[in-house]
């Protein structure tokens, strides 16, 4: 699940079971094209030894500019093989800005 809170993008995911799982890579791009995506984060497996029950994960991302961003999750097994999960997830990011104008009044 991906949500925008006005300042950061929150990415949440969960696993039912992790067998031989080393960790996860998160990727981000401005378009829905994985070949243009950049690795933004590695999250190690929360399961000791890469075997056992599942876990929940979260990552806070701060996109450099507003617009639509696409995210991909990939898992890496203990042999170093990466599996990218589709579909990608898109979210529109719009920074909230406040403009302060000087107060001008009659004296």
Label each region the model flagged.
Residues 102:
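Conserved functional hotspot residues at active sites or interaction interfaces
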Residues 7-11, 22:
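Structural beta-strand segments of beta-rich domains
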Residues 23-66, 84:
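Recognizes extended acidic, P/S/T-rich segments that occur
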Residues 5, 16-20, 65:
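Short glycine/proline-centered coil/turn motifs in the loop regions
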Residues 76-98:
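Extracellular fibronectin type III
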